[in-house]
């Protein structure tokens, strides 16, 4: 049988690192075994579906290049399929209508808890012939779960799991509003889509015995299951779809690249010898479910940043360039054609852990400087500074060959002419063209920012000083 895995998120919030890891493991397992990877969107609970969640899921998977072979399938488009199977189950006597009111079920649950019993349905309607009954009284449809025996399966991570059918009640498979329930839709989809292996979080493990019983009642193939441990935040709490901090969209917006996200997600509960860095091909070749551990993993921001920093320094320049401009386009960041952004990337990106940090540090390459916001701007309002800036403007304006060598020559000439230190002239130029006291090599900044922008910023700075103080201090 051909291997088929699936990733089936519910669009009820943000796709976080737990979902990314599940998708990655399922994708890797399929790729390693020459199988298929299916994307399915479980959107039957319309009251919980969040706007843009589907788009965020698709965007995140595409960004990570976790390409799917089939889908995306939407459960909301398959409602009639589920209802027809429920009708079949009613006719076969493996499902039944339950007319118990919410009030009765609440009282039943309350009494069971008071008597220290496990809350479960008492099967009041199980053996009543309500199939042909026509009534205005609301009802749900329940699956006739076996009342004897055990449900046994071998989890690929946790080993043999066994649970008595006495612990399980008759699962609701259709709500009173006519909508099939999550647990039922999942079973039908896994059956009809020929899913062979299901990798998902351990929070689904309690659903597995019920789903196996449903599949058995339909004479369907029982997939193999692997339930991964939870991923926790820094407070050791389960990741939430409502928390944007750990969402894939947040990491993308902060400038994390696919290789780093995948490499970090891979090792949240998985390890192979002492190796930390894996290419995508290595992941596909090495990945094995037996290397997944049972203990929960904790998001480590420093480690995540380390991975991103590593890849920003080690991927090819062309790929780095592609990712960078994709990030800039998404954030409406554009550079003048005179700015040598390739040089900026080559020389300075490696110092940073994310594109966001990088772009904020060197914002003066694409943003105009608000001179009035420069701290202690009045300190530069001196005649000597004005004279130096006019001298620099004249010299650089005449420069035809814009390269580092000639830029340094003009700076040295200015130092000798005005009898000042390199530090003094460098600070002045930095303030004028970047608005900051600290930058990398000033000659590199001048070179990369380009002649046009460099001269314009000197001109604007001089104009600002003249407008704000016509009598320059000595």
UniProtKB/Swiss-Prot annotation:
InterPro entries to which the protein is assigned, alphabetical: aa-tRNA-synth_I_cd-bd, aa-tRNA-synth_I_codon-bd_sub2, aa-tRNA-synth_I_CS, aa_tRNA-synth_I_cd-bd_sf, Glu-tRNA-ligase_bac/mito, Glu/Gln-tRNA-synth, Glu/Gln-tRNA-synth_Ib_cat-dom, GluQ/Sye
Family annotation (PANTHER family): GLUTAMATE--TRNA LIGASE, GLUTAMATE--TRNA LIGASE, MITOCHONDRIAL-RELATED
Subunit structure, interactors included: Monomer.
Protein name, as recorded: Glutamate--tRNA ligase
Organism: Buchnera aphidicola subsp. Cinara cedri (strain Cc)
Catalytic activity: tRNA(Glu) + L-glutamate + ATP = L-glutamyl-tRNA(Glu) + AMP + diphosphate
GO molecular function, one term: tRNA binding
GO cellular component, one term: cytosol
Motif range ('KMSKS' region): 238-242
One Pfam family here: Anticodon_2
Enzyme class: ligase
Role summary: Catalyzes the attachment of glutamate to tRNA(Glu) in a two-step reaction: glutamate is first activated by ATP to form Glu-AMP and then transferred to the acceptor end of tRNA(Glu).
Keywords (A to Z) from UniProt: Aminoacyl-tRNA synthetase, ATP-binding, Cytoplasm, Ligase, Nucleotide-binding, Protein biosynthesis
SUPFAM superfamilies given in the database record: An anticodon-binding domain of class I aminoacyl-tRNA synthetases, Nucleotidylyl transferase
Main location (coarse class): cytoplasm
Family that this chain belongs to: Belongs to the class-I aminoacyl-tRNA synthetase family. Glutamate--tRNA ligase type 1 subfamily.
